């Protein structure tokens, strides 16, 4: 059985390549829809749960850091909220996508299909949930005395695609290695916890001492998170953050794709 092409170039011309690419997108859509249904089919509130978790986390962090620790940051609730949702998209996608190949061994052995859609469907699934959070961000921004700008109509798709590309590279790399090193599933949980604190999610980069800022700038998620924050709180296209984010995304795609292409031929044997 064959659901998509992994050897299209030698089997046909551009028409076949286009057809198989279309099938891959259709399969990605079907997997994304299936994951969304399975995740919330037995719940009463459904998608509300995907919004409740980051909102609760933001509320707890606000009380702890603003009211107790007394962090001196203006409009700290916006600083938190505009970073928590895109970070949740990243963290949840990486965590769930890590065993995407390893947990689908039977499917990989029996069916030929574009295997990359397995981890990528997790990204798009969580991307839908991130999209549902955008009205909440807009509402909080408006209630804070600021007006959402038409710039958002450009900035949201641009930053969304950049973060999507970055995550695609990361999950292809990690999920490919997880087939051969199953301890990676446990290690990635610890890595993501540490990654959270070295990413300017609970604090803006502006308050970081200069001697430490250069190290945080080496974090691929730093320009992405700062970009979202600048877009939502300042209503400007974060050009200064966009170019580093694009470079990180391109590097991630290159490394992730290379790792996937070099290892996918051994998936069936390893599983």
Model-derived features: where do they sit?
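Hydrophobic transmembrane alpha-helices and immediately adjacent juxtamembrane helices
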Residues: 1-271
């Amino acid at each position: 059985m064959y659901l998509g092409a992994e050897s299209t170039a030698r089997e046909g011309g551009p028409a076949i390549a286009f057809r198989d690419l279309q099938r891959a997108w259709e399969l990605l859509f079907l997997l994304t829809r299936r994951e969304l249904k399975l995740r919330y089919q037995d719940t009463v509130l459904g998608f509300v749960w995907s919004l409740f978790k980051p909102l609760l986390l933001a509320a707890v962090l606000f009380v702890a850091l603003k009211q107790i620790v007394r962090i001196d940051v203006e409009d700290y609730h916006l600083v938190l909220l505009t970073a928590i949702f895109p970070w949740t998209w990243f963290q949840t996608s990486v965590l769930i996508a890590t065993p995407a190949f390893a947990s689908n061994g039977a499917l990989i052995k029996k069916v030929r299909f574009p295997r990359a859609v397995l981890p990528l469907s997790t990204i798009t699934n969580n991307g839908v949930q991130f999209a549902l959070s955008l009205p909440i961000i807009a509402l909080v921004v408006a209630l804070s005395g600021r007006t959402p700008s038409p710039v958002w109509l450009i900035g949201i798709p641009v930053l969304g695609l950049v973060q999507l590309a970055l995550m695609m590279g990361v999950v292809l790399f990690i999920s490919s290695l997880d087939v051969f090193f199953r301890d990676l599933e446990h290690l990635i949980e610890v890595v993501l916890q540490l990654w959270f604190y070295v990413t300017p999610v609970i604090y803006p980069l502006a308050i970081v001492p200069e001697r430490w800022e250069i190290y945080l700038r080496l974090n691929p998620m730093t320009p992405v998170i700062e970009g979202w924050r600048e877009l939502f709180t300042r209503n400007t296209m974060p050009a200064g953050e966009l170019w580093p984010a694009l470079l990180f995304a391109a590097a991630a795609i290159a490394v992730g794709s290379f790792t996937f292409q070099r290892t996918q031929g051994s998936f069936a044997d390893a599983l």
